[in-house]
Amino acid sequence: MFHSKLFLSFSLAFLIAGCGGGTGFQPTITGVKPETLQYGKSATIYLGGKDLRSNMVVETNGACVNPSFSSNSTTDILVLNCTVKVVGNFTLTIKTDGGVLVNTTHLTVPNPQVAILTSLGGIVLELEPAAAPITVNNFLSSANSGFYRNTLFHRVISGFMIQGGGYTTGLVKKDGQKDPIVLESNSGLTNLRGTVAMARTNDPNSATSEFFINHVDNGFLNYSATNPGYAVFGKVVQGMEVVDVIASKATAVTNGFSDVPKEDVAITAVLQIK
C-alpha cells in the first residue's frame, strides 16, 4: 500500500510539472497573418499556434528591424511588432530561445504609395525604394511628418512638368525642410511622362523637399556620363488626368518666380496610403 501511494504521488507531481503553462512543450505556429505591412512603418504581425512564448527569437535578415512582442500576446497568439525596411519578399523565421526552428514564413511588402491631395483633385504615386532608397525615405519622411500640408504646385509648364512641395501661398518658402540629400539619378529609373523626381539647384546634391511630375517624356533630364540628371523615385498610378489639369493652368511671373499658376494650386496633404 505504501509503495502504491508513493507511485501515485510521483505520477501526479510529474503531470503537474509537465503542464505548467505549456512551458514544457515545443511551441508550434500554425498561422501567420500580417495586419499592417507598409514600407518604413511599424508592422503588426499575428502568430497563431500553441505554447508560444515571448522570449522566442525573430529573424528577418534586416527586413523588419527592432522586433518585439506586444504585452497583449498570449500562449496562443503572439503579436509581433517591427519596422519594415525593405520592399518585395522577405523571410520571417521564428526560433526558440535555444535556437530550435519553430516556423518559417515568406512575406511580401508592396512598394509604398502616397496620395497627393490638391485643390484640383487627387494624385497617387507609387514609389521605388529599391532603386532610390535615400530619395524615397526623404520624401516619405516629409510626407509622414505633415511637411507638405498647405504647400503649392508653384511652377507649372505644360509639355514639361509640374513642380511643388517647397512654397506656401505668396511664394513663401516653407520652414522645416530637411538637409539636402545625395543625388540618386543613376538608378535605372528615367524621366518618362508620369514619373516623379526631385527638384534641385545646379548642385547635384541639393534636393530637399521639392519634387516634380513629368508631364511628358523628358529624356534630357536623365543621368548620363556628362549629365548628373534628376533623380526619379516613383510614378503616378492614379490621377494623371489631374496632372494634366494642373499643367494646363494659366501662369504668370510672380514675385520674381516664372511659370506660377495665376490661381493657387494647393497641396492640402501628402499621405502614405500603402
Which functions belong to the PLM regions below?
Residues 19-274:
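Cyclophilin-like peptidyl-prolyl cis-trans isomerases
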Residues 1-18:
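Sec-dependent bacterial lipoprotein signal peptides
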